[in-house]
Amino acid sequence: MKKLTVLGVGSAGCRITAKLREMPGAGNLHLLGFDCDAEALKNSGLPEEDQILAGVKWRQGHGCGGRVNEGKTAAAAERENLSRILADAGLLVVIAGLGRGFGSGAMSVIQSVTSKLQLPTVFLLTTPFIFEGPSRSRTAEQTITADLLPLAGAVVTVPNDLLLCSLGPDVDHEEAFALADRVMAQSAMALALTLCSGNRLAADYDTLCALLGRRHAVCSIGHASVAADESEKERVLVEKLLDSPIMGGSSKLKQADAVFMILNGGEALSLGDARAVFENARKYISPECEVLIGAGADPSWGKEMQFVVLTVKFDRNGSETASTEESLPAAGRKGRKRRSSLDDEFQPDLFSSQTSDLGVMEGTPPVIIDGVNLDIPTFIRKNIPVGR
């Protein structure tokens, strides 16, 4: 099995990535943490040599206080460093919690770097709890739709609010975050091992990208494990899966447009085991649903079997994200080579093309003439590149 890299971004991403160190199969992973907050990196539990401190000359090890633009600028300062570190990676899994400064701000930078390296990348992201407020939800949504979907191959977003369906009303918020971290770590491990192992049932990166299709989707993830010698293990695995904290119950399977089922186990894992588990799970899945399966065996799993299911529900209000070429104005395409954020080393991270970024005009009454918001700088509204 080839090694792959897992990059935890921001405090949540680093915490989740650190939990992978204790799981079976961790020896096949290169685990890294990326943040501008030195204390958060230190507290993540990742070894110091696997910590990437962003924008240290500017931030001096301090966090960006939830400010996305500052997080983006700090991350952009590490472009060359990231390119060097990721140059030999075979596949990258990026883990982050969206909604705040560095986790959201760094996404466009990472996407730019990995695209230039032609590095297959899966973004595994969580969106904020409802009690974190609408501002963080808007930030997360903006990051997904503007920074990732137009260019990223595989974007998996899981709402933390799914936890609220399985936790009692008196649950402590720290407990909720800890549980979300643990389940996301288990899911990231299963996804990584399946995409990079010598699978007994094939499921690769290109297939996952085709499944997601750069469309806006809400995902849920279920996780379950049993001893390989347990009686009726196929039935028990599926029952445990449906009770998983961020699965959302059997209704998520029934309503899904696409489902990715992953079974991992020790060397004794057989095709018969995989068939029995998948057939039991399919009882809860709509016949019209597109299903992708993967099964892999690794000695590090011993006598344990792990079953992970990713459900995908596409946003019916949107459509497939237009290609970068199609999204540019005609004037921006005619007579010259197309420029995208991938062609710029630093500029896009300072001048975001998101129309809602009003800078100092945020919160003031807009000046709108003929349907055009004149508070937004002309070069942003018209996608005019600014010379470096």
Predicted regions and their residues:
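Tubulin/FtsZ superfamily GTPase core signature
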Residues: M1-R388
